[in-house]
Amino acid sequence: MLFQDLSFPAAIGAVFGAVAISVAARCIYDLFFHPLRNFPGPKRAAIWSFYEFYYDVIRDGTYLWEIEKMHQKYGPIVRINSRSLHIHDPEYFNTIYAGSGRKVNKELSAVSGYTFPHSTISTLDHDLHRKRRAIVSPYFSKRAIAEIEPVIHERLNVLISRLAEAKGSIVDLTSAFSAYTADVVTYHFYGTHANYIGSKDFKYGLKDALTVLLNLYNLTRFLPVPANTLKNLPLPILGLINPNFPLVVSAREANKKMVLGYLNKPDEDKKAMKDARSKSVIVSALTDPNVPDAEKTLDRLLDEGETIIFAGIDTTARTLGVALFHLLNNKDVLMKLRKELQAVAKPDGQQWTTTELEAVPYMRGVVQEAIRLAYGLVVRIPRISPHEALRYNGFVIPPGTPVSQSTYLVNNDPSVFPNPQVFDPERWVKAAQDGVSLDKYMVSFSKGSRGCLGINLAYAKLYLGIARVATSLDMELFETTAKAISVYHTRGFAFPKEGDGAVKARVMGLCK
């Protein structure tokens, strides 16, 4: 009855007034009554997530630099939005990203941008995540990855051959490495690959779809419902909204075809596949009687496959690009790497194993430096201690508080890595000789019970890929400077201020 007596303008005014009162009340609560009210940080950042939204959505993934400024002004622990804290302290990283001894949940906003709600990486609850991870983790053990090294070498044979054929031409090494990593990771998950290395100019739809998702990451993190709705719209409508959106759906349909291709096989064929080769994740999971039926649904398999594939493609490809940039940009480093690898050269017809390359100190230094300066996920991935209060620097962090650190800030901390922007494999060699474990501070794969599932596969692709490409081909950088691989925008992964971070080179030919 109250609103019936109001004119339309008055009713609109009443609604806006109610909204204004609600917003004001929320601001007052966040500033003066919230459990985090006494933590350091600018007051504007403590009000909802407006400040974060402005820098990550409006200004395209630049909140990291504001957080860095906060630490410079307020110290190692700061409140970065109404309910979250950020800490910059390499020694405290393992406390936030804890192992199996303490429960850690994920924050909803941290996984909303993935748009794969049924995947392990998007699972919020600690216990459900542990169960889901246990299903697939055996297929990513060092032993399991060692068994697919022949496939990795076969793909590298094709990659090196294609690059050699481009003698005198300019190639996009990042795209080439993306095709290589895509072939390996899809083969491991599905038991087959699409020969992305054979695609023209190393361009393929799956990579384009990933680029679309990354460009949308910051928006979908704040607005997940519209993003998930888009996936279900017809392709023509998606194309009208954005010409690149259909690429995402097409990639999902291609993955769906692979899954259904196995699900629809006769039982005899499934058994033959399992008996012949049970190394692929999907074949192994679907034929494992210990895996609950609820974990074998089409949505689960699609989401799981897509997150493993997308995560396994771009991070490794970018790291390979960073490695080759620095090797080609500093020929002394390249020559030293070749010399050390020549000392452990294999007879004709034989290839290095990952284990053999890991034992070469300088090779290990090159790989670790590439990983450090590629950063992995550069966005904040908060962890929540649901029941236990954390203590840091005199502060008691209430249970249920999202707390995070930045891989970029840790990897560039001069107290751990002097001259952090310098690509210096010797820092790892010297640290090992001095009995210092820099691995403790290698956080590009995150840490703890939710650390990167595919770390062993990533290392295999990196060791074998860097060693073979660096010793097989002579190349020169083409119109690629350090700015091309620098970090300015954080869209899940690191992006430079301009361009897509591609490393380009002119192929001079095979090494003599």
Swiss-Prot record:
Cofactor(s) needed: heme
Alphabetically ordered keywords of this record: Heme, Iron, Membrane, Metal-binding, Monooxygenase, Oxidoreductase, Transmembrane, Transmembrane helix
SUPFAM superfamilies linked: Cytochrome P450 (SSF48264)
Gene Ontology CC annotations of this record: membrane
Topology of this chain in the membrane: Single-pass membrane protein
Major subcellular site: membrane
Pathway(s) annotated for this protein in UniProt: Secondary metabolite biosynthesis; terpenoid biosynthesis
EC number: 1.-.-.-
CDD domains for the chain: CYP58-like
Pfam families (UniProt xref): p450 (PF00067)
UniProt GO molecular function: heme binding; iron ion binding; monooxygenase activity; oxidoreductase activity, acting on paired donors, with incorporation or reduction of molecular oxygen
Subcellular location: Membrane
Binding sites annotated in the UniProt record for heme: C452
Alphabetical list of Gene3D superfamilies matching this protein: Cytochrome P450 (1.10.630.10)
Function: Cytochrome P450 monooxygenase; part of the gene cluster that mediates the biosynthesis of the sesquiterpenoid aspterric acid (AA), an inhibitor of dihydroxy-acid dehydratase (DHAD) effective as an herbicide. AstB catalyzes the second step within the pathway and converts (-)-daucane produced by the terpene cyclase astA into an alpha-epoxy carboxylate intermediate which is further converted into the tricyclic aspterric acid by the cytochrome P450 monooxygenase astC.
This protein's name: Cytochrome P450 monooxygenase astB
Organism from which the protein derives: Aspergillus terreus (strain NIH 2624 / FGSC A1156)
